[in-house]
C-alpha cells in the first residue's frame, strides 16, 4: 500500500500569477466600466490569498511583508485596482494587529482566515466629519467619510471618528461592514483606479461596542504601532512599481509587434531605432533602481515587524527614510514611464480600444494620496539636518 502523498501548498506568487492572468483578460473593459469587481474579489476569496499575512497559528499563511507586496506588484502589472484593494485589505489587518490587544486581533485574524473575510477602509484621518457619541459600554459613530477604498463588498471595516469629548482624539474601530446604519454610496467615478470603490460612506448612529475600539496600544502610540503608515507607504510604492512594470511590458510588446520606424529613421524596425532604444534604456534604469530601493525597504520592514515592541524610535525612523526614498523614486519613474510609453509606441497606440492611457491615469490618481513634495521635504530634513520623519498617519 502506497503512503499518501502530501502535496505542498502552492506558493502565493504562483497563485497570484494565475489570477493575474485571469484578471488581465477583462482589465481594460472593467477599467472603462468602473464599479465593484465582484467576480475578481470572489476569486481572491477562493484563492486563500486574503489570509496571506496572517500567522499560521491563526490559520493564515504567515507570509512576510516582502512576499505580500510581491503579490501586490503582480496584480498591479495588469489590474491596479485589484492590487490596491488587496494591499489595503492587508493594511487593515496590520491596523488591528498594531493598534489593538491580542484578545481583539487574534479572533479577527482567525475568522478572517477561516471565512476569507475581505477588509475595507473607512479610516481617512483627514476627514473629521464622523463624530463619536458615548454611552455606557458602547458608543455611536455618526457622519460621513470619503475615500473608503475597498469598503464595498467587504465583510469588515476599519472606521474612525472624532471624539470631541477628548479634544478631537481620533477613535478607530473594527466593525462589520453590514452593520445597521452604514451606507456605502458607490459614488467613486474618478479618472483612475476606477474599481477600487474609493467613494464615500455615511454612518448613521452606528453602534460600536467598546471591545471593537482599537485603544490599546492605540494609533501610533509606540514605534511598533507607528509601523502602520509605513506599511501603507510601502504598499503604494509597490503599487506604483507594478503599474510601471505593466506599462513597460505592454509598450514593449507593442513596439516589437506593431510600431513602425519614423520615415527618417535608417532602422529597419522600431526595435532597432536608436531613439526608441534610448527610451527603453532609460525606462530600464528607472525600473531597476526602484526595484532595488523597494527590495531594501521591504527587508527592513520585515526586520522591524519581527522586533515588535522592542523596535526603537530610531529604527522606525530609519525605516521611514528607506520607504520614503523608495516611494518617491517609484512615483517619479512610474509617471515618467507611463507618460513616455507613447514615445516608443507611436500615434496608433493612442487608439481608445488599447487604453494604454489607463496606466498613467491609475498611477496619477494613486500618487495623489499624499503629496510627494512633503515626502521629499522629510528626506531633505534627514539629508541636511539629520532629522528623521516624525510618525503621523502619512509618514
Swiss-Prot record:
Q: The organism sits in which domain of life?
A: Bacteria
Q: Which Pfam families match?
A: Acyl-CoA_dh_2, Acyl-CoA_dh_N
Q: Which PANTHER family match?
A: ACYL-COA DEHYDROGENASE, ISOVALERYL-COA DEHYDROGENASE, MITOCHONDRIAL-RELATED
- BP-aspect Gene Ontology terms: L-leucine catabolic process
Keyword field? Flavoprotein, FMN, Monooxygenase, Oxidoreductase
What CDD domains does the annotation carry?
Answer: DszC (cd01163)
**Coiled coil stretches, renumbered:** none
What name is this protein filed under?
Probable FMNH2-dependent monooxygenase SfnC
The EC number(s) given in the record are 1.14.14.-
Q: What does this protein do?
A: Involved in the dimethyl sulfide degradation pathway.
Q: Which GO terms describe its molecular function?
A: 3-methylbutanoyl-CoA dehydrogenase activity; flavin adenine dinucleotide binding; monooxygenase activity
Q: What induces it, per record?
A: Under sulfate limitation conditions, it is transcriptionally activated by the LysR-type transcriptional regulator, CysB.
Stored InterPro entries:
Acyl-CoA_DH_C, Acyl-CoA_Oxase/DH_mid-dom_sf, AcylCo_DH-like_C, AcylCoA_DH/ox_N, AcylCoA_DH/ox_N_sf, AcylCoA_DH/oxidase_NM_dom_sf
The organism encoding this protein is Pseudomonas putida
| Organism ancestry | Bacteria, Pseudomonadati, Pseudomonadota, Gammaproteobacteria, Pseudomonadales
Q: Which Gene3D superfamilies match?
A: Acyl-CoA dehydrogenase/oxidase, N-terminal domain, Butyryl-CoA Dehydrogenase, subunit A, domain 2, Butyryl-CoA Dehydrogenase, subunit A, domain 3
The first-level EC class reads oxidoreductase
Amino acid at each position: 500500500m502506497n503512503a499518501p502523498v502530501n502535496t505542498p501548498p502552492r506558493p502565493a506568487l504562483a497563485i497570484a500569477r494565475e489570477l493575474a492572468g485571469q484578471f488581465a483578460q477583462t482589465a481594460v473593459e472593467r477599467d472603462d466600466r468602473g464599479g465593484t469587481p465582484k467576480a475578481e474579489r470572489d476569486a481572491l476569496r477562493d484563492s486563500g490569498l486574503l489570509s496571506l499575512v496572517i500567522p499560521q497559528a491563526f490559520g493564515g499563511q504567515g507570509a512576510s511583508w516582502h512576499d505580500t507586496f510581491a503579490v501586490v506588484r503582480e496584480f498591479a502589472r495588469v489590474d491596479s485596482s485589484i492590487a490596491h484593494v488587496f494591499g489595503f485589505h492587508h493594511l487593515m489587518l496590520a491596523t488591528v494587529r498594531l493598534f489593538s490587544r491580542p484578545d481583539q486581533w487574534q479572533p479577527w485574524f482567525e475568522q478572517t482566515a477561516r471565512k476569507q473575510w475581505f477588509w475595507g477602509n473607512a479610516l481617512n484621518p483627514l476627514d473629521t466629519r464622523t463624530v463619536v457619541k458615548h454611552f455606557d459600554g458602547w458608543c455611536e459613530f455618526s457622519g460621513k467619510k470619503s475615500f473608503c477604498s475597498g469598503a464595498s463588498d467587504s465583510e469588515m471595516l476599519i472606521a474612525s471618528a472624532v471624539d470631541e469629548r477628548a479634544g478631537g482624539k481620533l477613535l478607530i474601530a473594527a466593525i462589520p461592514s453590514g452593520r445597521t446604519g452604514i451606507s456605502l454610496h458607490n459614488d467613486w467615478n474618478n479618472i483612475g483606479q476606477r474599481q477600487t470603490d474609493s467613494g464615500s460612506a455615511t454612518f448613521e448612529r452606528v453602534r460600536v461596542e467598546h471591545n471593537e475600539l482599537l485603544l490599546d496600544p492605540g494609533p501610533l502610540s509606540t514605534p511598533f504601532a507607528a509601523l502602520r503608515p509605513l506599511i501603507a507607504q510601502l504598499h503604494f510604492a509597490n503599487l506604483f512599481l507594478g503599474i510601471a512594470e505593466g506599462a513597460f511590458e505592454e509598450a514593449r510588446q507593442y513596439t516589437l509587434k506593431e510600431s513602425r520606424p519614423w520615415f527618417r529613421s535608417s532602422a529597419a524596425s522600431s526595435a532597432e531605432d536608436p531613439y526608441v532604444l534610448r527610451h527603453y534604456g532609460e525606462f530600464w534604469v528607472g525600473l531597476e533602481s526602484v526595484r532595488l530601493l523597494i527590495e531594501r525597504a521591504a527587508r527592513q520592514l520585515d526586520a522591524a515587524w519581527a522586533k515588535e515592541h522592542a523596535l526603537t524610535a530610531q529604527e522606525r525612523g530609519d525605516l521611514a527614510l528607506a520607504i520614503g526614498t523608495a516611494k518617491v523614486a517609484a512615483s517619479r519613474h512610474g509617471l515618467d514611464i507611463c507618460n513616455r510609453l507613447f514615445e516608443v509606441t507611436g500615434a496608433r497606440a493612442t487608439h481608445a480600444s488599447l487604453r494604454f492611457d489607463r496606466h498613467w491615469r491609475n498611477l496619477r490618481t494613486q500618487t495623489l494620496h499624499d503629496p510627494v513634495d512633503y515626502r521629499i521635504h522629510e528626506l531633505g530634513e534627514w539629508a541636511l539636518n539629520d532629522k528623521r520623519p516624525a510618525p503621523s498617519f502619512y509618514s
